[in-house]
Amino acid sequence: MSKLKITGGNPLFGKVEISGAKNAAVAILPATIMASKGVCTIENTPNIEDVHCIERILNGLGCEIKRQSNSILQIDSTNITKTDANTEDVRKMRASYYLIGALLGRFKKARVELPGGCPIGVRPIDQHIKGFEALGAHVEIEHGAVIVKADKLIGTNIFFDVVSVGATINVMLAATLAEGNTVLENVAKEPHVVDVANFLNSMGANIKGAGTDIIRVTGVKELKGCTYSVIPDQIEAGTYMIATAACGGEVTINNVIPKHLESITAKLIEMGVDVIENGDSVTVKSKGNFKGANIKTQPYPGFPTDVQQPMSTLLTIAKGRSIVNESIWESRFKHVDELKKMGANIKVEGRTAIIDGVPKLTGAIVKATDLRAGAAMVIAGLLAEGDTEILGVEHIDRGYPNIENKFRSLGATIVRL
């Protein structure tokens, strides 16, 4: 298994291009299953392991996939007949549950192995099941697989008990090809929810209200292929913003939607970091001298849970005490023990981390326990004194394209071994 070696202490300067959004791509690609006519050309897809994993899954189901470049995929799902997704790729990747909504919508049946992904606590799919059943599907969980069947899907009103990105997207997928009108309430508003809705509409769906509290879906009889470009990745952008703040320097982060970054931008400015918005880019200027802040993760437009771990790393060297409350996922402090190896002063109580800033971190051998923890450890290595080796790089590769090359272009000393 490969690892990253980082010699810390270099300020970051230059420009970095942000790739397409992982969280959008891993839903849009399964949604191409629903196009019974024509070819879907998906542009600005990130060149990451999670996308490669979905490519393999779709191939196994009978989709014809042509990769035109590192960021453009052509997917022809017209001849797909298989509705049983049971490979190891399905089991290891959480976003494979979007196959359920896509297959149920088009074929009115699906069997999908229960998915995996990052080990960050209990991540149930009860709200997905509630939505599918409300549309008229029969749902069973048997031998580690979700089995859904329906004679037909009928639109209805569905109120989610909790705000769930996955359930919002999955039920929206199924409702797109249901009969009549579906109203989804207490839905997630994340940018990638809106992106999936926009993609479905480009295929011929009738979805209104994505990004608001209520999504209204008028069912259509079929969807057709289209050309669509995935939105920029707000989490990747936030990671480079935080890294620049931590290391000092000046970096312009291109191909972003600044509105999607507002909660991150506001927190960095509160800490004393300069952030300048310029159309489709943001520039971060930092002297490496900033104060602590309190963070509470919340659904969009609140502070994103996927940026909590990188931000926690920044706070380890901030002046004063910071309190981080993780309200979205339990067990998302697995990076803390690794940061402690580098000299961080952090105490975890339940879903809260109390961080007292220290003058510096020092290099150590650490591991990436999950995707965003991996990004946190890269930032820790960049800001630390001395050499850091990061094991478990496969987690990082799931969501960050060419992370070592991008940081190296900014002046970091980082290599893959």
UniProtKB/Swiss-Prot annotation:
Cell wall formation. Adds enolpyruvyl to UDP-N-acetylglucosamine. HAMAP family: MurA. It is an enzyme of class 2 (transferase). GO terms for molecular function: UDP-N-acetylglucosamine 1-carboxyvinyltransferase activity. Phosphoenolpyruvate binds at residues 22-23. One of its GO terms (cellular component) is cytoplasm. Keywords: Cell cycle, Cell division, Cell shape, Cell wall biogenesis/degradation, Cytoplasm, Peptidoglycan synthesis, Pyruvate, Transferase. NCBIfam families: murA (TIGR01072), PRK09369.1 (NF006873), PRK12830.1 (NF009470). Pathway: Cell wall biogenesis; peptidoglycan biosynthesis. The active site is at 118 (proton donor). Its EC number is 2.5.1.7. It catalyses: phosphoenolpyruvate + UDP-N-acetyl-alpha-D-glucosamine = UDP-N-acetyl-3-O-(1-carboxyvinyl)-alpha-D-glucosamine + phosphate. InterPro entries: Enolpyruvate_Tfrase_dom, Enolpyruvate_Tfrase_sf, MurA_subfamily, RNA3'P_cycl/enolpyr_Trfase_a/b, UDP_GlcNAc_COvinyl_MurA. It comes from Clostridium botulinum (strain ATCC 19397 / Type A). The keyword Cytoplasm applies. It comes from the Bacteria. It is found in: Cytoplasm. The modification 2-(S-cysteinyl)pyruvic acid O-phosphothioketal is found at residue 118. This is UDP-N-acetylglucosamine 1-carboxyvinyltransferase. UDP-N-acetyl-alpha-D-glucosamine binds at residues 94, 123-127, 306, 328.
